[in-house]
A protein has these predicted regions:
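Canonical positions in the second alpha-helix
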Residues: 72, 133, 178-179, 222-223, ...
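Short coil/linker segments at helix-helix boundaries
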Residues: 47-63, 93-170, 196-238, 248-269, ...
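Register position in tetratricopeptide repeats
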Residues: 94, 165, 199-202, 243, ...
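Start-of-helix register in tetratricopeptide repeats
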Residues: 42, 83, 154, 188, ...
Length: 510
């Protein structure tokens, strides 16, 4: 079909009607050859389609068809009204595509034979005719929908989305409303209107906030009503649930006391639906965290426990980030036993997850499980040897075991080891801290800092190994940091080009 886009596919099909008289009764198949003036108009439409398919301008043929179809002197004007309307819709769809016709002008500019000097808007005219076709020929609704969502609508929506992303809210809203003239079935215009209202909400005065909150929620709720039963809009539905959850969460601070619990539940439900539609473990973890935050805002710890409890009861149904987030919620609002089980679930999936190892170490101290703490701290220091805090876990483990043994020799040995690692942590001349670990499809980015705890400037070379879940080294990268002044901090970034990176470690700094 060459340059035929979605809505022109229907136009091209229409040109084959004459050659295909035997069609199913439930197809969009209006008569377009009689009366005579209609047949001539249909022929002009076919010529316009052929011209467009050859990268030409279909405006002349489209105007010819429109003139024939609106000529008040044409014979048998009262016959085959539905065929006339459909063919006029085709002609206007041609004008709406890559033609030289203006968007605003006089009726003469569009080929109309009546009221030629009257001002006209091509979008408004097209919408009126398309509506007539939808009413007269319901079986052609899909065809008309394709006309409505042609290049002008797509272009207008793209400009609206760009304006929204650039913060040009007046322009974005005007373009979205313009797009709604042509098509009111796709949700995208309401996405723009909801996004614009949300941006206005962020900068609004206290007096204006309720208005913009209501506007944004109204538009985004409309998006869900339009899109939630159409799988092709899955991304739109997912993002709208997230936006509505964020709006609900943001409204909690200023909400009347009687409404806070209800608003929290509504926001959490949107985040829950976002989690259901999530495309990644990271998105699902974010949703769980947001749910926890809104319930924490209103002191609903029972609901928070239900969140991480649902994950804990089905750990294989979640990825390591969602499990880790649930463990953190259990740490904050539940019991150490619950948290430990979730961190163990993370480590069964990825034994090299630094955050899970560290959080598990803290949790085992709370549980007085010092024998279990030692192997966890050993795994942690193997990954992160130049963070003094990690060696403190060794000291805690040995001190705890010393307190609990009845064997005097073992008590002395444990105490000596505890003292050794405590001194090691205190004397360490630098501290490595990580601020970002972003594993992506074909690479992983790690950012961190090195704090010089010594008394003179130092330059460091940090060598980082990217690991898979089995501990295999997938890539090795290094960064030079410094010179770093005494008691100061230097930053570093390493980027490993590898697929399947799940963790990392670095070689000890000398």
């Amino acid at each position: 079909m060459n340059s035929c886009v979605k809505f022109l596919a229907g136009l091209a099909c229409a040109s084959a009607i004459v050659a295909s008289p035997a069609r199913a009764q439930d197809e969009c198949n209006p008569e377009q050859n009689a009366p005579q003036f209609l047949g001539r108009a249909f022929f002009a439409v076919q010529k316009g389609i052929a011209t467009l398919n050859n990268s030409g301008d279909p405006a002349t043929d489209a105007r010819t068809a429109i003139r024939l179809l609106t000529d008040p002197e044409a014979r048998d004007r009262d016959k085959n009204v539905s065929g006339q309307a459909f063919t006029l819709g085709q002609a206007l769809a041609l004008l709406l595509t890559q033609s030289s016709a203006p968007v605003n002008g006089t009726r003469a500019d569009f080929g109309f034979a009546t009221d030629r000097e009257q001002s006209a808007d091509l979008y408004v005219i097209a919408d009126s005719v398309f509506t007539v076709v939808e009413t007269l020929i319901p079986l052609c609704a899909d065809q008309v929908s394709a006309w409505r969502q042609g290049p002008p609508w797509v272009g207008t929506m793209n400009k609206a989305l760009t304006a929204l992303s650039e913060g040009k809210l007046d322009t974005a809203e005007a373009l979205a409303r313009r797009a709604l003239i042509l098509d009111r079935r796709a949700p995208y215009a309401y996405v723009v209107l909801g996004g614009a209202a949300r941006q206005r909400l962020a900068a609004a005065s206290a007096a204006d906030k309720p208005r913009y909150l209501a506007e944004s929620r109204g538009h985004l709720t409309r998006v869900l009503e339009m899109a939630q039963n159409d799988t092709s809009y899955r991304d739109v539905v997912r993002s709208s649930h997230y936006e509505l959850g964020e709006l609900g969460a943001a409204s909690l601070a200023g909400a009347p006391a009687a409404e806070r619990a209800t608003r929290a539940r509504e926001a959490a439900e949107h985040f829950k639906q976002y989690a259901v539609l999530a495309e990644s473990d990271l998105q699902r973890a974010d949703a769980l965290q947001k749910m926890g935050d809104v319930f924490a805002e209103v002191g609903d710890t029972a609901s928070i426990r239900a969140i991480y409890g649902g994950v804990s009861s089905n750990p294989t149904g979640y990825g390591e980030r969602a499990l880790l987030t649930s463990g953190i919620l259990a740490t904050r609002f539940g019991t150490p036993v619950e948290a430990a089980a979730l961190y163990n679930a993370v480590l069964s999936t990825n034994p090299y997850n630094r955050d899970a190892l560290r959080n598990q170490a803290v949790t085992l101290i709370k549980l007085n499980d010092f024998a279990g703490l030692l192997p966890i701290s050993q795994r942690l220091t193997a990954l992160d040897p130049n963070n003094p805090e990690n060696w403190v876990f060794h000291a805690y483990a040995y001190a705890g075991m010393a307190e609990r043994t009845s064997n005097a020799a073992m008590r002395r040995a444990y105490t000596d080891s505890s003292t050794k690692y405590d001194r090691m942590a205190t004397a360490m001349p630098m501290k490595v801290t990580f601020t970002e670990f972003s594993p992506m499809e074909a690479e992983a980015r790690i950012r961190g800092t090195i704090e010089n705890l010594g008394t003179s400037p130092q330059t460091y070379t940090i060598i980082v190994e990217m690991l898979d879940r089995s501990g295999n080294v997938l890539a090795t990268e290094q960064a030079q940091v410094g010179p770093v002044a005494a008691k100061a901090t230097g930053e570093f970034t390493v980027l490993g080009k590898a697929t399947g990176v799940a963790a990392f470690r670095y070689k000890p700094l000398l």
